């Protein structure tokens, strides 16, 4: 048993090493760009939205005294051209980096970004590329299936009922972190069918009953 466990451990460490190398390569391969204004970013997207795989946007911290586009402005322009925000990274004492990338096929919409996109359409700012992403999402159901952001996410009522039937799982659920709580909510909200949602609920109840989490 020890031998097998040792082999598993080596394999796991090897895979983790590969992931770190890939992340490092990803970091180095994506260009860093700075834009002073929202118009500068919009002009860049007009020329590059269909041929760029994404960028790291350098954004100045509020108290830095530097002038750059801010995150909210960047997100608005990104949505207009069918792009979306991804993760962020610290860079220096005065700046941080926000990743913006083209929206992947079939990627889910958050309710916040759906509302922002709707407002951009109504104000006449939405560009053809962004409108095409909205139309695709409406056609395949992703628009109506938009999920809550972490700040607004509520535990689905049917999952609360399942928790009430399992005191042990419920007690552990009440102790888990906000990240783990949202991970469960997000997976339930984004289930494409009722059968998938029910299966996920059963899986999560069993997981919580054993004192385990997704992260």
Predicted regions and their residues:
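Charge-dense, helix-prone N-terminal extensions
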Residues: 2-215
